[in-house]
């Protein structure tokens, strides 16, 4: 395996570059998935039936906390990748751990939000609006949950094998995935929550 030391570690082999390119293609498919879910939501968001609408169930404070946690995690994962590129394994792992803890905090708030909805009688079966909303939020939440366990697995590999072209490639691809989830959340925050609160 030929290593090009003039490139960042995650790009240093032809195989690594192909894996990163392949992951961008995968993210394209993920964009299609979330675009479909957003389209369904925008089509059904006025069909509340006898259930509540967004303005009646959305609470701004928890949503702001969720946004703060995810956007901060995007910053810390970026710091982790920077630390990886300069060969600082401890700092890289520390920033990745902080990222995952922030993601865990986000999930905790989201689970509490879903529990609150259910206690208020707003379930996936109540209306088309709630069905579309919970499918969109749930899909994003499942992606964050998967990302958490994926990040833990990468940290375990870096801890046992150190930073090498393979582990750096995996960590970088994970960071792309995490940034993607943050971008999706910005759209959810802007076009689902804020739009729902002011409509």
Question: What are these regions, as identified by a protein language model?
Answer:
Residues 1-199:
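...captures the hydrophobic TM-helix bundle architecture rather than a specific catalytic motif
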């Amino acid at each position: 395996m030929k290593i090009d030391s003039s490139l960042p570690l995650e790009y240093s082999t032809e195989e690594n570059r192909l894996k990163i390119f392949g992951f961008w293609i995968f993210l394209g498919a993920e964009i299609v998935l979330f675009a479909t879910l957003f389209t369904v939501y925008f089509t059904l968001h006025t069909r509340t039936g006898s259930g509540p609408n967004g303005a009646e169930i959305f609470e701004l404070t928890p949503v702001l906390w969720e946004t703060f946690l995810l956007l901060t995690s995007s910053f810390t994962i970026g710091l982790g990748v920077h630390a990886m590129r300069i060969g600082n394994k401890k700092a890289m792992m520390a920033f990745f751990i902080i990222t995952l803890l922030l993601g865990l905090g986000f999930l905790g708030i989201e689970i509490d939000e879903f529990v609150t909805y259910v206690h208020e009688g707003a379930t996936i079966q109540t209306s088309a609006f709630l069905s579309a909303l919970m499918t969109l939020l749930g899909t994003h939440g499942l992606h964050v949950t998967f990302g958490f366990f994926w990040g833990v697995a990468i940290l375990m590999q870096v801890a046992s094998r150190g930073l090498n072209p393979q582990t750096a490639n995996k960590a970088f691809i994970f960071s792309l995935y995490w940034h993607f989830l943050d971008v999706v959340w910005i759209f959810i925050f802007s076009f689902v929550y804020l739009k729902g609160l002011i409509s």
